[in-house]
Amino acid sequence: MPSETLWEIAKAEVEKRRSHGSEGDGAEIGEKSVFFIGSKNGGKTTIILRCLDRDESAKPTLALEYTYGRKTKGHNTPKDIAHFWELGGGTSLLDLISIPITVDTLRTFSIVLVLDLSKPNDLWSTMENLLQATKSHVDKVIMKLGKTSSKASAEMRQRMWSVVQKDHPDRELIDPFPIPLVIIGSKYDIFQDFDPEKRKVICKTLRFVAHYYGASLMFTSKSEALLLKIRGVINQLAFGIDKSKSICVDQNKPLFITAGLDSLCQIGSPPVPDSDIGKLQAHSPMELWKKVYDKLFPPKSTGTLKAVQDPARDPQYAESEVDEMRVQKDQELEHYKRSSSKTWKQIELDS
């Protein structure tokens, strides 16, 4: 009997993985993926490069970027592979969120939301838009997964509650994100010079949001010590390395709070006088915190959040043949516009 061909072996391996995946036995299936979303120019690429030990300068992310990393857990063992995705453009490209998050990748997927602490007026809208868009898509994928494997879907929903202990006093008051979520506040070196009261509001607000979604929260900057902490957290998501149990809730220091270790009691109420809380009409705790935050940091108009640069003119994406053809077509278009304008003017004169 002839030996199996490489193609037959590969086909059998794919079918084997599919059969294991449909069983939904709760095992860690496949290679892990980490999706970085967040503020435009917030430092997402820098964090990824640091986690992968790549000594290269960060370039602006145009749309959706992909890279991967490998790590060996032990001697003579195959390297684990992790996939890193990054969404550029802040909140301007929300439709691209659906590309990397699929039924096949969902169970090994994590989200890292990077927020620029130096721009507090953009912070809430960036966070809200990205988390809502991501959660909406993930919920749809979970429903789709449930149609093929109800057990796998149920295990996913059970797993999202695993970050909160069963006896946690806030268990009935929070709504964990459907997949692991880490919120990183970047540019702490600028943030630490803010007015203490402003720092207090931002810290308490982010602590509430992170706790409500069952997420980890940490601040970082160019400091090597902080970057090493962040690297450890990302490695845990990407390669399953032991999770840190350290915690720092002092608003005068970089926050570092692992999911499930905070509480509403420790966070306290929104930083607003009790007499004003009744005036803020809110239908949920999240809405109340938003109103309090927006009062101190009014969101900028949508127009100021949009990218003003034209990526087609960015020199790092130059393609001589394409650019020459683009110039030619632009000239032809201008010529057509002028010709059309003259034609319409002539028609108006004749009439």
Curated annotation (Swiss-Prot):
Q: Which UniProt keywords apply?
A: Cell projection, Cilium, Cilium biogenesis/degradation, Cytoplasm, Cytoskeleton, Developmental protein, Dynein, Microtubule, Motor protein
Q: In which tissues is it expressed?
A: Specifically expressed by ciliated cells in brain, lung, spleen, testis and kidney (at protein level). Enriched in the ependymal layer lining the lateral ventricles (at protein level).
User: Which locations, inside or outside the cell, does it occupy?
Assistant: Cytoplasm; Cell projection, Cilium; Cytoplasm, Cytoskeleton, Cilium basal body; Cytoplasm, Cytoskeleton, Cilium axoneme
Domain of life, per the record? Eukaryota
Bias class Basic and acidic residues marks the residues at 323-335
GO function term, MF aspect, one:
dynein heavy chain binding
Record note on quaternary structure: Light intermediate chain of the cytoplasmic dynein complex 2, a multisubunit complex composed at least of eleven different proteins. The cytoplasmic dynein 2 complex consists of two catalytic heavy chains (HCs) and a number of non-catalytic subunits presented by intermediate chains (ICs), light intermediate chains (LICs) and light chains (LCs).
Which InterPro entries does this chain map to? DYNC2LI1, Dynein_light_int_chain, P-loop_NTPase
GO BP annotations of the record are:
cilium assembly; determination of left/right symmetry; intraciliary retrograde transport; intraciliary transport involved in cilium assembly; regulation of cilium assembly
Tell me the segments the record calls region Disordered.
303-335
Q: Decide whether keyword tRNA processing is in the record.
A: no
Its family? Belongs to the dynein light intermediate chain family.
Q: Which residues form a coiled coil?
A: none
Phenotype when inactivated?
A: Death before 11.5 dpc with defects in notochord and floor plate formation and a reduction of definitive endoderm. Mice also display anterior truncations of the forebrain, defects in the ventral body wall, in closure of the neural tube, and either an arrest of embryonic turning and heart looping or a randomization in their direction.
Give the organism, scientific name.
Answer: Mus musculus (Mouse)
Q: What is this protein called?
A: Cytoplasmic dynein 2 light intermediate chain 1
Report the SUPFAM superfamilies cross-referenced here: P-loop containing nucleoside triphosphate hydrolases (SSF52540)
